[in-house]
Amino acid sequence: MERLIYIEKIKIDDKTVLGLKVELPDSPPLLLMVGEKGFIMCGYLNVEVAERLQVTAAMVSGVKSFQDILEAEIKAATSKARELGINLGMKGREALRKLA
């Protein structure tokens, strides 16, 4: 199977975030959307480690596309993300506005 990595610029209002999608064998893709202040990750990545590293990050789950991330609810967030106003249950699009 050919594995592919996709990188895409995505507009959120007047800002741009970077989307990274890695196709994986026999599983959903690994997804990440990165803004200037932090990032949203899919459930493959570990929020507890992000917290220990003191980064600004939030996590969504059950996503297969960038559009899914925008529509998904935040399931976990580091303390630095919460300081920016990113709360559990917030939509990914709203969180990215704060991270862009």
Language-model-detected regions and their locations in the chain:
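Residues that scaffold, gate, or flank divalent-cation-dependent active/transport sites
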Residues: 2-100
